[in-house]
Each structure stands twice: as C-alpha cells, then as structure tokens.
Amino acid sequence: MNIRQYFMGLLLMGGMLGLGSCMSKPGILVPTNPIQANQLPKIYPDYIGVTVPATIAPLNFNVEDIDAESVNVVVEGSKIGELQSEGDYANFDIDEWHHLLAQNRGGDLKVTVYVEKKGNWTQYKDFDIHVSPYALDDWGVTYRRIAPGYEVYGKLGIYQRNLSNFEETAILENTAAPGACLNCHTANRTNPDQFTFHVRGDHGATLVSQNGKREWLKAKNDSLKGSMVYPYWHPSGKYCAYSTNTTHQSFHAVKDERIEVFDQASDVFVYQPSPHELILDSLLMTKDHYETYPVFSPDGKTLYFCSSTAEPIPSGYKDIKYNICKIGFDAATGKFGNQVDTIFNARELGKSATHPRPSYDGRYIMFTMSDYGCFPIWHKEADNWLLDLKTEQARPMTAANSRNTDSWHNWSKDSHWFVFTSRRGDGLYTRLYLACIDDKGNV
C-alpha cells in the first residue's frame, strides 16, 4: 500500500485566432471589438470568486453554453504575470499556472473570458480568483468514491489525489475483496504512516497500518456490540479511538427524503495496537445512550465524542439528537477520566451535532449540524459549524455552507484549510470542496 502525504513564458497556442484578433500584451492574443456582455460567464466548475492555495492544480473549466464554438481565457495576476488558454474549454498549462500563482500569493487573479458563437466573439465581465497567503503543504486528499446507491453497489474504493496536479491512485478497491464495502479511512494528523480503515461484509475486518506493518482485526468480538467503525488516532500514535455501531438503513415514504441511516446501538472505546488491547469504560458504553464519532484533542488529553439518548425505532427516530461531549484521557496510563461533560448542546437547539473534528492547532472543533440523527449526508438541511474552544461559542460556517447537504470534513495539517463534502452540485453526488480559514476565524 503506497499512501502519500496528505491533507516561463506564455502559452504557445496551436493556431492563430485569425483576422479578428489583436495582441493586447506581448504574446496574448484576444478578439478585437467583441460584444460586451454585462454579466459573468456561466462556467463549470464555478470558480468565480473562490480562494485557492498557490499550489492548487489548474482550475480548468467549461463554458456552459451549447452554442459556444471556442473559448479564449486570459488570466492576469494582480502583482505580475499572465497566461492564456484558447480552445474548446479553458485548459491551462500546469507549469505556467503554478508559476503565476506562486508570483501572486496573497493577491488576485483577474480572469477574462471570451466566447465565440456563430463566428462572433462575446466578452463577459471579469471575475477574480483569490490566491491565499496560507500555504497548503499537504500532498493531497484521500476519499472513498462510490456511485449514489442504496442497497446494492458495484465498484468502489479508497483513493488519493495529488492536489497540485490531477494524479489519482487507488489505495484499495473492492475488486481486491469482492462484495466488500470499504469505509471510514483515517490517517494520524494527515500522516499516512499510521492509517486505519474498516471493511464491511462477510469477510470484514479493520486494518491498522503503522510504518508499513499491517494488522487485520476481527470485525466483531465478545466485548463489542459491532464492528470497529469510526476511528481517530491519538496524536502520540499509541492509541486509536473507535466507535462500534449497529447500523441500519430505511427508505422514507415522504417527498424530498430518500434514505435514513441510523444506529440502534453504538459505543466508544480505545484500541492500543502495541499490546493489542481494548480500553473500555462504562461511561462510554451506556445502555441508554448512543455514543459515536470519537476524536482526540490535539494534545491527546481529551476524547471528544457524540452522544444521544437511545430512542425507539422507528417511532422515535427523529428524536435522536446528538450532543458533543468530552472525557479526559491519560496517555501515560491509558485510562479515562471519571466524568463526561457536554461542550455543545445541540438538543437544546432542536438539532443534532455530529462529525466533530478538532483543528490541529487546538482552536476549533468543526462539526455537522442537522435536524436529527447521526448520518447527515442524506439530510439536505445539514450544515457545517465551528465551535471556538476559547470563547465556547459556535456558529454556522455561512461562507462555506450551501442550500444543500454540507457534511463530512477534515483539517489540513496547519489548520488553515479544510476539505468537506457537499451535494450542492446536483443534490445526488457528494463532491469534495476546499475552504480556507484565517487567523481570525474568517472562512
């Protein structure tokens, strides 16, 4: 398994634009006397006004116009430099792109789009792309890719993508384990030297990989109610927290709601790989509550998790609302504290808080808020929130949220970037999005 660290000159054009072009700057050819459109271009993906790291891969895009015959795009840095792409779509030279962004880190890129339709050129309003002053030093991202489905699925896998180009490689695909479902992959603070994920199915197991040494753990044992599902590493690498979940899926019979995924039992525990021992505590394995989604604080002294009162299924499924709780943890002894505290009470707001993820600088906890339940990816109302651990105030991340599902997320190593999932594109497919957060908490 090869897992990587996660998470010039002008473009030479293939041909002249013809007599209807002029040279606005040395080496940059643009149409003469184009029709001026008092609107922004409709492009896909929509990169208008986005903020990007200087190392991001070229933001190539299509113009959403079936009558478009050719596209001419000029990108000019606010500090220095420019580049151009001309053809069926905007397809920037990768070396020129990286050079331009490196020159304009902390500045802006002005993008001018010309579109040819029926032999006539139209120039749209310029838009900006902001180049963040914060570096994204992580190599890339890992993710699971699976087509939207319900009970039956085909090929799926866990993949890694280099964010500075378009290189994608498979970490593991279910073709290696037919009929298996791969999920819940987690590295230790973005370091793939320590990695774990769970395989569901008849031959299911949990993989714990440390510095090239792999250990496959039995999916269930007498001490647990179910498999080792949602993991999170202790920063020391000596422990890994898991939840064990008895999960079910049902179909809705109402408009605009498809699936409900819920737990009928769940507990939290810690696994210590070196002596191959489970660390169990009755405070995290209660009969009248569901405990799930454990995560360690960056200093390793606290274990955060989500907890809801157990409710009857199916009659009480909308009453399952999770709060974010914490308990102390002593890495020297491997023992928990003697008290559980609630740090964010979502139930009081009539909501459910899941997927807590502390920033690695210890300042924030990002989490997903939905109306109820523990699986917000199917909840259109789900948004990501930010809990400030200094002020103890929580707020929705309005700048990054959308009118559709916004859910699972994770931080970059320096805590200035995060990747999250959203269905804002079409309401069906979950795609990955990047966002930046500055020193003042502005997203």
Region locations from a protein language model:
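Conserved, compact domain cores that house catalytic/ligand-binding motifs in diverse enzymes
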Residues: 140-224, 230-231
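Hydrophobic beta-strand positions that form the internal "hydrophobic ladder"
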Residues: 194-195, 237-240, 300-303, 365, ...
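Contiguous beta-strand segments within globular domains
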Residues: 44-67
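C-terminal motif of bacterial Sec signal peptides marking the signal peptidase cleavage site
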Residues: 18-21
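Short, conserved, GDST-rich strand-edge loop motifs in beta-rich repeat architectures
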Residues: 138-152, 242-264, 305-322, 367-381, ...
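Low-complexity, Pro/Ser/Thr- and charge-rich linker/hinge segments at domain boundaries
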Residues: 43, 121-150, 223-224
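Multi-bladed beta-propeller domains
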Residues: 32-46, 79-96, 164-181, 209-227, ...
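Residue-level detector of Asp-centered blade-edge/turn motifs that repeat once per structural unit
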Residues: 189-191, 235-236, 298-299, 360-361, ...
